[in-house]
């Protein structure tokens, strides 16, 4: 087999974010190396915090100080200021724009490339104040490719929540100028992975993946079969617990806690079951139309006038024009068809601004775009 790192670099996905996305895939160390998280037992006993807490401190059976690992152990955020802390982690070049790659053979000895993506927070950002579900600390998603005997991709499988979707390599959209690079359209807030841009009906909600955000070629952190040890740590990457909401979920286990870690073919089976179940889904309702917006600059703020019939909430996102930064977002409830909201910009640069409306059911619209001129 060709060196795993070479194969993983050759076919690493280009992550195409939604225009309103606030959380980008980064090193798993964004969850251990900063002072905002704690490793603790299920009863709340704190075991470690940074700088003692690090990826190297984690293991399948014992921690770096010799204490035993328990399956109920959790790394959780202390302040819940997810936006600020994720932004601080992303600002550090050592941590931002990473995927964790692994070459693994399945139970039929077919070779797969797995790309595990870690996100600081899972936030559907449908309308913030309207929905209490669909949000959790930590988010592991993945893309995997099956290679043939000549080590060329033949099948791609993308995770989508608890489901997955599979396509032959010939039907996968590639990056311009590179037939080796699959495009992965990342859904707003949920980070589900799609083969095409647009609004995707899951049977319960819409995932919006408009593909109008930054396009990132991440660096690959190479993983082995059961190494580094943090990858098979059995604890929880976040302390969020699901409620009765149909869009809610627990924080996830790490890569080694997923069945496809041991046998990549199992995810292809999930994709087959997902396709079969899709026929029984209820018909997709009409998604709300995007708001009509007009933006003016008032010093270090953007004033957004909107017209959004029947909207109950509005999400507004800004990033410096032309940058590859995650968006900064605010979510506000609204009443009436028309109104204004203000967004802090922070400096004199030009900004791109995107706005999405949500209806009373929490379904979010596609984004409307505008440019805030420099001051």
Give residue ranges: language-model regions.
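A domain-level signal for the mature, folded cores of soluble proteins
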Residues: 1-139, 151-286
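Proline-enriched interdomain boundary motifs that mark the N-terminal boundary
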Residues: 285-294
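Aromatic/hydrophobic beta-strand junction motif of beta-rich domains
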Residues: 302-308
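Beta-strand signatures of extracellular beta-sandwich domains
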Residues: 315-319
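Aromatic sugar-binding surface patches on proteins
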Residues: 335-341
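Surface-exposed, short loops/turns at beta-strand junctions within beta-sandwich domains
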Residues: 342-351
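Extracellular fibronectin type III
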Residues: 360-375
């Amino acid at each position: 087999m060709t060196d795993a790192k070479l194969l993983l670099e050759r076919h690493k996905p280009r992550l195409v974010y939604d225009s309103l996305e606030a959380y980008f895939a980064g090193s798993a160390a964004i969850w251990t190396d900063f002072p905002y998280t704690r490793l603790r037992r299920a009863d709340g006993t704190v075991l470690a915090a940074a700088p003692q807490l690090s990826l190297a401190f984690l293991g399948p059976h014992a921690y770096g100080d010799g204490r035993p690992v328990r399956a109920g152990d959790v790394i959780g955020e202390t302040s819940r200021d997810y936006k600020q802390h994720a932004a601080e982690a992303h600002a550090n070049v050592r941590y931002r724009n990473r995927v964790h790659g692994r070459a693994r053979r399945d139970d039929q000895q077919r070779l797969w490339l797995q790309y595990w993506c870690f996100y600081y927070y899972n936030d559907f950002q449908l309308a913030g104040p309207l929905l209490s579900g669909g949000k959790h600390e930590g988010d592991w998603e993945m893309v995997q490719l099956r290679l043939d005997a000549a080590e060329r991709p033949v099948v791609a499988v993308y995770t989508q929540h608890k489901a997955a979707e599979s396509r032959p390599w010939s039907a996968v959209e590639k990056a311009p100028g590179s037939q080796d690079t699959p495009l992965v359209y990342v859904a707003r807030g949920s980070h589900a992975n799609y083969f095409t841009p647009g609004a995707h009906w899951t049977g319960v909600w819409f995932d919006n993946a408009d593909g109008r955000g930054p396009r990132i070629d991440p660096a690959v952190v190479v993983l082995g079969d059961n190494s580094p040890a943090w990858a098979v740590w059995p604890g929880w990457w976040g302390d969020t617990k699901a409620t009765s909401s149909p869009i809610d979920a627990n924080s996830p286990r790490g890569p080694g806690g997923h069945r496809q870690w041991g046998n990549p073919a199992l995810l292809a089976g999930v994709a087959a079951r997902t396709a079969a179940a899709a026929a029984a889904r209820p018909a997709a309702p009409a998604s709300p139309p995007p708001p009509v917006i007009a933006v003016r600059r008032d010093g270090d703020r953007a004033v957004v006038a909107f017209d959004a019939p029947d909207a109950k909430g509005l999400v507004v996102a800004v990033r410096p024009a032309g940058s590859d930064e995650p968006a900064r977002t605010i979510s506000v409830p609204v009443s009436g068809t028309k109104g204004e909201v203000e967004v802090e910009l922070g400096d004199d640069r030009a900004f791109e601004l995107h706005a999405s409306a949500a209806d009373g059911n929490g379904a979010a619209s596609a984004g409307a775009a505008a440019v805030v001129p420099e001051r």
